[in-house]
Structure formats: structure tokens, C-alpha cells
Design a protein with these regions (language model features):
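Topogenic membrane-insertion module of multi-pass membrane proteins
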Residues: 1-44, 48, 52
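Intramembrane alpha-helical segments
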Residues: 5, 83-149
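Residue-level signal for inorganic ion chemistry
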Residues: 16, 68, 91
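Membrane-water interface at transmembrane helix exits
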Residues: 31, 35, 39, 64, ...
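Membrane-interface elements of multi-pass transporters and channels
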Residues: 36-41, 66, 70, 119, ...
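Membrane-embedded alpha-helical segments that form the functional core of polytopic membrane enzymes
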Residues: 39-63, 126-129, 133
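Acidic (Asp/Glu-rich) catalytic motifs at the cytosolic membrane interface
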Residues: 55-79
Length: 153
């Protein structure tokens, strides 16, 4: 087990799982490339999409970390990368706050896109938040529908 101070910046960085951010950035990059090829590329909406996708990926990682710990799925002796809540690096209460303080900025940043795409985008943002939770939580977690997690370390 790594020696990491409880609720430290290092603990939060490990909980954010930076290696998974490529999975959030790739579809945005593809969309930006398609917009560029069509002559419609704009820097601000592309940057906003990158920030929103990255924050939602981090929020999903925090949610996964918290609920797997609470359900006992992730334990201190788990195989694979260590998880922050299971290791005691971040308390469940602090992780709940981390989820809130990641989703709220994601939604505020994402709301800039309403000026480009209209109010219908609110539904897309809402679905992003819902599926971030349903990946790990609920009666039929999405993470259990597949045999592997390609984006995980």
C-alpha cells in the first residue's frame, strides 16, 4: 500500500484517475476534427467540450470509487490499481463532496454550450450526470454489463 496522506492533493489526483481522461477526450477530439473538416470548428465550444468531458469523467471515477467502496466491491486487498476510498486515502464524506464539487463546475462550464446549441443540450448534460451515477450505482450497474473496462488502468 502506498503511503498517502488522507484527503491530500495526491489522494485526489489518484482518485481522479488521469489515465482515463483520454477516454473522455477522444470523442471530443473526433467531433472537433469533424467540425474542422466541415469548416465549422470554433475554439471556445471545443475547449468547453473538453473541460466538460474531463470533469464528467473525473466525477464518474469519484462516483465509482465511492460506491464500490460502500458496496464492498473495492477492498484494500483488491487486484489492480488501488482505490482512494477503499485505501482510506479519501473518506466517503469527502468523496461525496468531491463528486458535488466536480459535477457542479462541469454543468456550469457545459452551460456555455447552450449559446451554441440551444436549450436541448440540457437533456444531454442531464444524461451525462445520470449515466455517471448509473455506471456503478442502481439495481443494474452499467459496469456489470460488460466483461472488461477498457478505459481503466
Amino acid at each position: 500500500m502506498k503511503e498517502i496522506k488522507r484527503n491530500s492533493w495526491r489522494a485526489w489526483l489518484l482518485a481522479a484517475r488521469p489515465k482515463t481522461l483520454a477516454g473522455a477526450a477522444t470523442p471530443v477530439l473526433i467531433g472537433a476534427a469533424l467540425a474542422y473538416a466541415d469548416g465549422q470548428f470554433q475554439w471556445l465550444p471545443a475547449l468547453v467540450c473538453f473541460l466538460f468531458a474531463g470533469l464528467m469523467q473525473i466525477a464518474a471515477n469519484f462516483i465509482n470509487d465511492l460506491f464500490d467502496c460502500l458496496k464492498g466491491t473495492d477492498r484494500e486487498d483488491r487486484l489492480g490499481p488501488e482505490r482512494a476510498c477503499a485505501q482510506g486515502w479519501i473518506s466517503p464524506g469527502a468523496m461525496k463532496l468531491g463528486i458535488i464539487f466536480t459535477i457542479i463546475p462541469a454543468c456550469l462550464i457545459g452551460s456555455i454550450l447552450l449559446f451554441y446549441a440551444g436549450w436541448q443540450l440540457i437533456l444531454v448534460g442531464l444524461l451525462c450526470v445520470i449515466f455517471a451515477f448509473f455506471y456503478t450505482t442502481g439495481p443494474y450497474p452499467l459496469c456489470l454489463l460488460y466483461t472488461s473496462d477498457a478505459a481503466d488502468e
